[in-house]
A protein has these predicted regions:
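Bacterial N-terminal signal peptides that target proteins for export
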Residues: 1-13
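Bacterial N-terminal signal peptides
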Residues: 10-22
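Sec/Tat signal peptide C-region and signal peptidase I cleavage site
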Residues: 23-29
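Short, glycine-/small- and polar/acidic-enriched structural segments
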Residues: 30-167, 171-177, 181-187, 200-209
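Short linear loop/turn motifs
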Residues: 64, 71-72, 161-163, 269-275, ...
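Pocket-lining segment of extracytoplasmic ligand-binding domains
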Residues: 89-90, 169-259
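Secondary-structure end/capping motifs
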Residues: 223-303
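Conserved C-terminal helix/tail region of periplasmic/extracytoplasmic solute-binding proteins
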Residues: 293-329
């Protein structure tokens, strides 16, 4: 039987329509969005999961992830080169200094970082007069490391030399090659460090609670594109839900193996600590945000006290959590 073009189109539409109706978040238009991230870290995993399993697509978005240094990503958000940046600390500090940006949600609220050292360095105190590698200067990991050293009676500006050693692989290599005595690396790289013969001195997540990553946007987009921001935040929050659901462990471990380029057993070992770092509601308590700002003031990253409303805007993530809670069976 032959059909006219109009009838064929009608039949095709009838087949497609039920699939569209069954997807509650699916929109007609597709928006291209860019998210800047600073490194191959656990902090990007919620976004990766949301992208891999089509959660942004279901929200009517096509995602492009762009590797970018934190300070540059803030500028890129302001100028509109990217819609979002995950460097929560850099976004918040920039906002505190008057730049037109805000953090919309917190993706990781626990510093899932290890301090690892070469053989013979058995305590944090033994780092006095020695060197410690970090990814970069001025970012959240830098400030977190200075705060951790202070908690252990070490002045990071006087008693310890903080040296930029780059990402986790190059930091481990820097210890092995004798360029530094220790380094700060994130989960799951402590498993790689241990296999390389390095010693774990401390896990920062045991002694401090700080927002390590989020989703930052410009004040202009908050005012002019609230629907886009709401959908992006909702997809990212669904990514957190996916990671935290133990039923998805196999899929999450698979993403870890692919993203971090590690073995399956290493991903399995690091899985538990990693998922603990993701706040289920995408927000943190005010006192945690205040502590983050206080550390930034103490280390000279910002000078003046500011209200939290100047640096964060959690309206979108709170609305998204309410919507998702209602949608649950």
């Amino acid at each position: 039987m032959r059909f006219s073009a109009a009838k064929r189109a009608g039949c095709l539409f009838a087949l497609i329509l039920p699939a569209i109706v069954c997807r509650p978040w699916r929109l007609d238009a597709i928006d291209n969005i860019k998210i800047a991230y600073p490194s191959t870290s656990f902090t990007t995993m919620p976004i990766l999961a949301a992208s891999k399993f089509g959660l942004y697509q279901q929200e009517g978005m096509r995602l492009e992830l762009i590797l970018m240094r934190p300070n540059i990503s803030v500028t890129a958000v302001v100028t509109g080169q990217v819609e979002f940046a995950t460097a929560h600390g850099s976004i918040v500090r920039a906002a505190a200094q008057g730049m037109p940006v805000k953090s919309l949600m917190v993706v990781a609220d626990r510093p899932a970082y290890y301090l690892v050292a070469k053989a013979g360095v058995n305590t944090v105190g033994a780092l006095r007069g020695r060197s410690v590698g970090i990814a970069s200067l001025g970012g959240s990991v830098h400030l977190m490391t200075k705060e951790f050293m202070a908690q252990n009676n070490l002045d990071a500006d006087k008693n310890v030399a903080l040296v930029v050693t780059g990402d986790h692989n190059t930091s481990i290599q820097a210890i092995q090659n004798g360029h530094v005595d220790a380094a700060v690396i994130s989960v799951p790289w402590q498993t790689v460090a241990e296999k390389a013969g390095l010693r774990k001195l401390a896990y920062f997540g045991d002694v401090m609670r700080l927002p390590m990553a989020g989703l930052g946007a410009s004040d202009e987009n908050i005012a002019k594109k609230p629907d886009l921001l709401r959908r992006a935040v909702r997809a990212t929050l669904r990514g957190i839900d996916f990671l935290r659901d133990a039923k998805n462990k196999k899929e999450v471990v698979g993403i870890m193996v692919e993203w971090f380029k590690i073995h399956g057993e290493q991903a399995q070992e690091a899985y538990g600590q990693m998922v603990e770092a993701y706040p289920p509601n995408g927000v943190v308590a005010d006192e945690v945000l205040e502590k983050d700002l206080e550390i930034a003031r103490q280390t000279g990253a910002i000078k003046n006290r500011v209200t939290l409303s100047r640096v964060v805007d959690f309206q979108f993530v709170k609305a998204a959590r309410n919507e998702l809670s209602v949608k649950k069976p």
